[in-house]
Design a protein with these regions (language model features):
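Primarily extracytoplasmic ectodomains and periplasmic/lumenal surface modules that are beta-strand-rich
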Residues: 96-99
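Active-site-surrounding "flap" and adjacent substrate/cofactor-binding loops of secreted or lumenal enzymes
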Residues: 106-110
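Intrinsically disordered, low-complexity terminal tails
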Residues: 1-49, 383-389
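Core alpha/beta structural scaffold of self-assembling particle/tube/pore-forming proteins
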Residues: 38-67, 71-75, 87-91, 101, ...
Length: 389
């Protein structure tokens, strides 16, 4: 491991300790940051990296760390600042200039490439927490108690973001951002249909597996121009809140805002394996029998082959809990090393195969990998998707 990587790990650990001493973190969260310091990868800029570099106070970094604990997407997703206050405009090449075979004394006509501008909008995701003043006063560490109460609201932010990243459709919900599924919604009749692979499911319990190569030049998250990692926290102070019966009580409020979006600069760097029949997968029968041409292991290999260059960014598979579980089981059944479960990376012990190192209770587990590409879990990937054709 390079010296710079060691220094980054030490710095991240020190940040956790400093935030703990300032009262911004409870001990459990601080320990997660110290453990998480061992997980950094050079060459990729995720939301936490941006937050740490742009907000020296540590407040935004703390929020991002909490988001990162319960959303595996943020672990690898690369982010960049949009070039618009409300989104990001990308110029996409739609055609190449023509070339001709020239003869002697024959002129060459001028030619140019064709380009199109695509604007990806950013959505504003908000939530607020209200904690009874007396409940706060009962706890010695008031700020830590408020932060712990706010974690449920941050989890709501997490789930909404993950759901929108895959299924957001601005034609139906204009206040959100455009997700991946509407962009990769057809196998035939669309230019990017070559990157939509069917697993053969025809019932009502279908899901999708996604392969995404994160990079500012391929696919990445965006946040508004001039903002700090898109996440804001405002302490609303003490005010009158209302219960279910519209009766007043004094509360301490917090407002959380996450301005975020998604831009696809090059559609070739995402592949959707759709129509994965969950019943067949669990039973290892039908479309998901080991001998079937539509078995997900075979289709994941095909998905990787559709990517022009796996080194163009950070490649990651995303699947729901059931799919990831079956891949972990396959890793134990197979003698070859196509699928593997990485061992724990430090002395804190192991949890169930497929768990994300550094999350949960502060102990580290293995990461499921397919041909070296990590497989991340996302519970927001539905198991009742409509059949894609």
């Amino acid at each position: 491991m390079k010296l710079t990587t060691h220094l980054q790990m030490i710095f991240a650990a020190l940040v956790g300790l400093v935030l703990l001493s300032l009262g911004w973190l409870d001990p459990a969260t601080a320990s997660l940051m110290v453990i998480g310091a061992t997980l950094g990868q050079s060459g990729k800029v995720n939301l936490h990296d941006i937050a740490k570099s742009l907000d020296p106070s540590g407040k935004t970094a703390t929020v991002v760390e909490l988001l990162n604990q319960s959303n595996e997407i943020i672990t690898d997703m690369v982010w960049m600042e949009g070039n618009l206050p409300t989104g990001h405009e990308t110029t996409v090449r739609t055609g190449l200039p023509t070339a001709i075979w020239r003869q002697l004394y024959q002129g060459v006509p001028a030619s140019k490439s064709q380009r199109a501008k695509v604007t990806d909008a950013i959505g504003m995701l908000e939530t607020r927490s209200e904690v009874d003043v007396e409940a706060v006063n009962l706890n010695a560490q008031n700020e830590n108690f408020r932060l712990s109460e706010a974690k449920a609201f941050l989890e709501g932010l997490n789930q909404q973001f993950a759901q929108t990243m895959f299924y957001g459709n601005t034609a139906i919900n204009p206040e959100r951002f455009m997700g991946l599924a509407p962009r990769y919604s057809a196998i035939s009749g669309a230019t990017n249909g070559v990157n939509v692979i069917s697993a053969g499911g025809a019932g009502a319990d279908n899901t999708s597996i996604w392969l995404i190569v994160w990079s500012p030049e391929t696919i990445c998250g965006i946040y508004p121009k001039g903002s700090v990692a898109g996440i804001q926290h405002k302490d609303l102070g003490e005010y009158d809140a209302f219960d279910a019966n519209s009766q007043r009580f004094r509360a301490l409020g917090d407002l959380w805002k996450w301005k975020c979006g998604l831009t696809v600069s090059d559609w070739r760097y995402a592949v959707r394996i759709c129509n994965v029949d969950i019943s067949d997968l669990v039973g290892q029968t039908g479309t998901q029998a080991s001998t079937a041409a539509t078995a997900i292991i075979k289709l994941m290999i095909r998905a990787m082959a559709r990517i022009p260059s796996m080194g163009a960014g950070v490649p990651v598979f995303y699947a729901n809990r059931t799919v990831k579980e079956m891949l972990a089981i396959a890793a134990m059944d197979k003698s070859q090393n196509a699928i593997s479960v990485e061992p724990a990376i430090n002395q804190f012990g192991q949890v169930a195969p497929g768990s994300v190192a550094g999350q949960g209770t502060g102990i580290s587990g293995g990461t499921v990998r397919f041909l070296g590409v990590p497989v991340r879990g996302c519970d927001q990937l539905l198991t009742n998707e409509a059949v894609v054709s």
